[in-house]
């Protein structure tokens, strides 16, 4: 069975060593595995949320495209495209926006962080917040759901957005699927072994901290940057502490286990920091020199990059265009020539009811959700060690087993046989919480024939 994997990088800056080791290199390696259908894209619509400098965005698109290819991505074996070359994505974003609950988007980490910062500074909670920032998770959901990605490699700060994509896709399926699921429900993939590299000052390597080492800068500039890596004051001949040395962490991310063990031993034996920095430069230059040359060749031939990306977009649209047509049909955006006429003769839709949805969580445990008739989540179960246990509780609730709803602040818990088995969402006020409890009681009430 083929697994579809999707990865995007926002085009707001020049790729650095941290981007390469943390995202680009592992993604390229994953694309070379058997049984994988990989989609890689330049998230240039997302870039507009954070950056209003057109020249910077244009330059970053070029640099990131060249970086993927110079790093070893084979465009003939993957689908490689620019987000902005797929017009179906913004259209799908709107379809999903129309079913995405505002309360769900209110809980997005990036939006909440902006609101919290504004409140802390005594400003209006939404000061400086654009609709782009607020609805960013819906655009990300469209990126994922457009191609029915099964797995989405992300950093821990992005797990919530993949979960939101699941929720939005699930709600669309419920409202318009009529027994069919249009969208596969994606899973976030966290690579525990992926490196998070320190920058020149020891903090996480980030453009925000101005502490990066550009990936394909010249050998001279790379050597100069490495010379500025902060180290302790231990002199040559004094034993160094590799586990607390940022320079060693960088070396470890690019070396073989044998090279790393040898470098560790040299530091313990008193290798001077100047010599250690020279070792790091030699390691990086040896790995990146050929890729650097290819990168600069690509940068010098932007028309070739354009052709590669347009070919990837054409490949992606062979999937996106017919799929969006199905979605348009599902929501009622149909041709008047269609044999199915939206007239009074069409039978009234069958009344939708609440439903239980089982799934397996990232940690391998089993859980279930209870969705209301409109697709809103009413309950999220606690974790169960196996599917049988989760299914038994779900079945007992569906059969009208005596459940006890207990209010917990602006949320509530569901108890069964003296044990808490599920939790409700966190609500903005008591009225919304009480309305949800009413819907829950109706959903769990035994059905009369």
UniProtKB/Swiss-Prot annotation:
Segments carrying motif 'KMSKS' region: 204-208
Binding site for L-tryptophan: 143
GO MF term set: ATP binding; tryptophan-tRNA ligase activity
Any Gene Ontology biological process: tryptophanyl-tRNA aminoacylation
Catalyzed reaction equations: tRNA(Trp) + L-tryptophan + ATP = L-tryptophyl-tRNA(Trp) + AMP + diphosphate + H(+)
Sorted UniProt keywords: Aminoacyl-tRNA synthetase, ATP-binding, Cytoplasm, Ligase, Nucleotide-binding, Protein biosynthesis
EC annotation from Swiss-Prot or TrEMBL: 6.1.1.2
Signal peptide span: none
GO CC annotations on file: cytosol
Sites where the protein binds ATP: 10-12, 18-19, 155-157, 197, 204-208
Main location: cytoplasm
Span of the annotated motif 'HIGH' region: 11-19
Cellular location(s): Cytoplasm
UniProt-listed Pfam families: tRNA-synt_1b (PF00579)
Keyword rRNA-binding: no
Subunit structure: Homodimer.
Annotated NCBIfam families: PRK12284.1, trpS
Family recorded in the similarity comment: Belongs to the class-I aminoacyl-tRNA synthetase family.
Functional summary from the UniProt entry: Catalyzes the attachment of tryptophan to tRNA(Trp).
Protein name (database record): Tryptophan--tRNA ligase
Lineage per the UniProt record: Bacteria, Pseudomonadati, Pseudomonadota, Gammaproteobacteria, Pseudomonadales
Gene behind the chain: trpS
């Amino acid at each position: 069975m083929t697994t579809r994997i999707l990865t995007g990088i926002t085009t707001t800056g020049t790729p650095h060593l941290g981007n390469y080791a943390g995202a680009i290199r592992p993604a390229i390696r994953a694309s070379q595995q058997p049984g994988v259908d990989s989609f890689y894209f330049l998230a240039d619509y997302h870039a507009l949320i954070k950056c209003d400098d057109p020249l910077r965005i244009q330059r970053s698109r070029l640099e990131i495209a060249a970086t993927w290819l110079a790093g070893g991505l084979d465009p003939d074996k993957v689908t490689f495209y620019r987000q902005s070359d797929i017009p179906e994505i913004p259209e799908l974003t709107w379809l999903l926006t129309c079913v995405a609950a505002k309360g769900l988007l209110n809980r997005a980490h990036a939006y909440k962080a902006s609101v919290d910062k504004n409140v802390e500074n005594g400003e209006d909670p939404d000061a400086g917040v654009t609709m782009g920032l607020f609805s960013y998770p819906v655009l990300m959901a469209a990126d994922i759901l457009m191609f029915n990605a099964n797995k989405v490699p992300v950093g821990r700060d992005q797990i919530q957005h993949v979960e939101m994509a699941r929720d939005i896709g699930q709600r669309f399926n419920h409202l318009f699927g009529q027994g069919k699921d249009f969208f596969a429900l994606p899973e976030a993939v966290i690579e525990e072994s992926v490196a998070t590299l320190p920058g020149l000052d020891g903090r996480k390597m980030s453009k925000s901290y101005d502490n990066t080492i550009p990936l394909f800068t010249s050998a001279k500039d790379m050597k100069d940057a490495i010379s500025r890596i902060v180290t302790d004051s231990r002199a040559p001949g004094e034993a160094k502490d590799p586990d607390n040395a940022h320079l060693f962490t960088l070396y470890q991310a690019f070396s073989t286990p044998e090279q790393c063990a040898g470098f560790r031993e040299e530091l313990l034996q008193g290798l001077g920091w100047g010599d250690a920095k020279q070792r790091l430069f030699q390691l990086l230059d040896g790995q990146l020199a050929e890729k650097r040359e290819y990168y600069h060749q690509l940068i010098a031939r932007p028309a070739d990059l354009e052709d590669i990306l347009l070919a990837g977009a054409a490949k992606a649209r062979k999937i996106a265009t017919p799929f969006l047509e199905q979605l348009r049909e599902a929501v009622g955006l149909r041709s008047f020539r269609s044999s199915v006429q939206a007239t009074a003769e069409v039978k009234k839709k069958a009344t939708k009811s609440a439903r239980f949805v089982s799934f397996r969580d990232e940690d391998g445990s089993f859980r279930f959700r209870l969705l209301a008739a409109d697709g809103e989540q009413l309950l999220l179960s606690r974790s169960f060690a196996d599917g049988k246990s989760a299914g038994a509780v779900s079945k007992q609730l569906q059969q009208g087993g005596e459940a006890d709803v207990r209010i917990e602040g602006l949320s509530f818990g569901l108890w069964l046989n003296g044990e808490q088995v599920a939790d409700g969402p966190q609500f903005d006020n008591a009225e919304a919480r009480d309305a949800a409890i009413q819907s829950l009681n109706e959903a769990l009430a035994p059905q009369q024939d």
